[in-house]
Amino acid sequence: MGRSVKKGPFTDTHLEAKLMVLNAASEKKVVRTWSRRSTILPEFVGHTIAVHNGKKFIPVYVTENMVGHKLGEFSPTRTFKGHSVKAATEKSSKPS
């Protein structure tokens, strides 16, 4: 279930406050945050937010298409190394 429309979108207050200060001064600094749970608001468009993925900060440039999504969606936490090639070598090594 999604969040109630009555409540409105959730964003951490410290993140929203930092971006409002940057908007008022019309600055474009990179803002570092651990708040992957925050919803992207229209006021965030045009800013670069460095989102923590558990190991390092991934810079995310916010565009209009991202509004309504969570910051964590754009900072992957897992790296896919690929499946093992063991099954492929077993098939090719069988004598015919």
Swiss-Prot record:
GO BP annotations listed: ribosomal small subunit assembly; translation
A Gene Ontology term for the protein's cellular component: cytoplasm
Position of the signal peptide: none
Tree of life domain: Bacteria
Any one Pfam family match given in the protein's UniProt record, by short name: Ribosomal_S19
InterPro entries registered for this protein in UniProt: Ribosomal_uS19, Ribosomal_uS19_bac-type, Ribosomal_uS19_CS, Ribosomal_uS19_SF
Molecular function terms, GO-annotated: rRNA binding; structural constituent of ribosome
UniProt keyword annotations, A-Z: Ribonucleoprotein, Ribosomal protein, RNA-binding, rRNA-binding
Keyword Iron: no
Family note: Belongs to the universal ribosomal protein uS19 family.
HAMAP family cross-referenced by the UniProt entry: Ribosomal_uS19
Matches recorded under PANTHER family: RIBOSOMAL PROTEIN S19P FAMILY MEMBER, SMALL RIBOSOMAL SUBUNIT PROTEIN US19M
Chain's role: Protein S19 forms a complex with S13 that binds strongly to the 16S ribosomal RNA.
Name of the protein: Small ribosomal subunit protein uS19
